[in-house]
Amino acid sequence: MIIYFAVITCSLKLCRSYYKMLLNVSHTIQCVFSRMSWYTLAVILSTLVTIHASQGPEKFTLATAIVLKRGEDITWSVSRENLKYNYRTVVDTTSKAFAVWHTAGLNFRFVYNYSEAMIRISFKRRFHGEIGYDFDGLGSLLAHAYLPNQGDLSSEIHLDNDEIFSFSMKDSDYEGDNAPTSYFWTVLHEIGHSLGVQHSASPSSIMYGWYKSRSFGNGTIVLPKDDANAIHQLYFSNTKQYAAIPKFEKNKVVTTTPVPPADRSESTTNTTITTCFSFDSLSEIKHDATKDSISAYCAGVYDAISYVRGDLYVFVGDLHWRFDTSGMLHNGYPQPTGATWRLPSGSQVNSVFEWMQYIVIQTGKRYNLFVGTDFVRSVNFKVAPSITFASNNRVYAAFLGKLKDITGHLLRRKNLRWRYLPPIQLLQNELRAATDILVASNGMYIFKSGVHGVVVNGVVEHYKLNKGVWSNCR
């Protein structure tokens, strides 16, 4: 049976000891989305939206509701391929992790036939067929898991085979600064993702946004109420639609379904989105950045702004800031852009966007194509576009206030005529002064110096300051 997986993934970079607990994380990730009802379990939900369970104490978010036949077992298996640990030890420890989730009312069953299992667990190294989701060797990135298919359950959990996992379930084996990484706690968290549960804002939750080796106690692990409630909503209530699963990293949480920050009272179509951004203060950021770039960023004046691999990137001068969708600045940022991507010396970043398998960085007349951070090639234009962005696998550039489709030119096709887009009001009135366009999951944003506006039916109704929304320096 061929299983088609959602392209949405979640990954786990786990902190091996107590990381500097960014105390406001439980507040920054709470977001509100409208409820959408459906009257039969047979309906497969296809639209993913973000919600926060604000009607009670729950702090979890979920993926699309799963349809299981009554009494159906969720099967799982472990691959022997590349396995450097004792197979029986891995299976036994994994079975104990599934037993914890079983207490929420789900039935799990181990099967030897790996290809027939609903949840398949395997060990991988470095690049393993997933662009943008490579493992990184020993340390940092430990595992990632696929979101279940919409409407049914089929998922994979990959663990980094370069890591050194401990299968011990004794607290004394995880004490000290050089404590090993617990396979049990790692796979327990990833199973939650493979079942469709996103991160929780509750520190006591198994699905909390940072890894920590918890106490095994007397060997009986109790599923926290927050996680049990998530399973109940996902498998037994099926009354809501939920969000995609985030990556889970060592010092931050990264969601693969980006939702740009919006004003608390702002509505788009039939859905009200509230995204609560809380940024680290500049005094807590260690870097050698120039004062001009920092000042411009804090004033909300950007050279380019874009979502790349689910993270929000803001480019100012020779620096770039990288944020997850809970609004947390990634550890170690801002960073010099030239230290991440090999760009021409002294070049100015004008636009950044994802297109096909590439990350494309426009520097004047030149388009630099990267796979990850590896330079592939460049494409040069005679005239430098003012802004460039990608939408629906097409690339558009603004020349003198007019948008042109330049997809074919990036593909180096010859004798291709540039196609003008329809002259909607946005293109006529806004593009000449625009500094960038951001295409997000819930709409399009146009940026000018220090301000941004939401594009609705080709028209920007009003502009708001970037300061305090897309950047917030305290």
From Swiss-Prot:
Signal peptide start and end residues: 1-17
Protein name: Putative matrix metalloproteinase
Cofactor(s) the record lists: Zn(2+)
Keywords: Hydrolase, Metal-binding, Metalloprotease, Protease, Signal, Zinc, Zymogen
Family statement: Belongs to the peptidase M10A family.
GO cellular component, one term: extracellular space
Pfam families for this protein: Peptidase_M10
GO molecular function: metalloendopeptidase activity; zinc ion binding
Keyword Transit peptide: no
PANTHER family: MATRIX METALLOPROTEINASE, MATRIX METALLOPROTEINASE 1, ISOFORM C-RELATED
UniProt cofactor note: Binds 1 zinc ion per subunit.
Record organism: Heliothis virescens ascovirus 3e (HvAV-3e)
